[in-house]
Amino acid sequence: MALGSALVTSCLHLLWPARCAGCDTVLGSDDAVFCGGCAQATLPIGNACAGCALPHFGPPARLWCPGCVRLDFAFSRAFAAFEYGGPLADAIVRMKHGDRPEAARRLGRLLAEPLGRALAPSVGPPIDAILPVPLHPRKLRQRGFNQALELALVARGQAPALPLLSLPRLDRTLLRRVKDTRELGHAGPSSRRVAVFGAFAVADPARVRGKRFVLVDDVMTTGATFNECAEVLGRAGAEEVRVVALARALR
């Protein structure tokens, strides 16, 4: 049985070889996400601020950077895996705009580590549900998939913090996008806050009251989208919201 399964896997690899998410080079293993060169150029965030998720160089015990310590966030903690740039940025753009849902499922492996940190008991009480940041229905029809959902599906199954049976559920319908925001591209923080204001709504407040959530998205650019989602959940009675991104854009 094992031999047959290995043979099928080998045949599939020959017919449809795994390719690097960054440069599209054929990989030697289906388990890899990047080739060696792209993996080296994909930079982990490391020690980061709990508010903006940007790298900071203070002691690890210091959660907040000087710029965020006096700010009021709607979420309690932010986590990100990598700096947005280089091969990872190429992979994310290709995933979102090149009709590559399978790329989202592969990149989801890289989201498992920060999601595990967000779910860890040392961070706070247990999370009730993981929420992917939703797309507007029009954009979902155009793209064919929600990259945040695809990332979350994979990352949830591989998050190292908790055994599979005790993982929070993934709720894909609780948070809705009710305003079709334009592509924000290089928009600054204030423009992004204005663009996403009123863009999200809760489908059923009864499923929110007193609950704790983790929001998941592909890129955290300024934090405006995460903060707006967290505010909407907070107004509906959420006890806590943490946020997790695959990549964090550097200022």
Language model features: what each stretch is:
Residues 1-251:
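Glycine-rich phosphate/pyrophosphate-handling loop used in enzymes and phosphotransfer proteins
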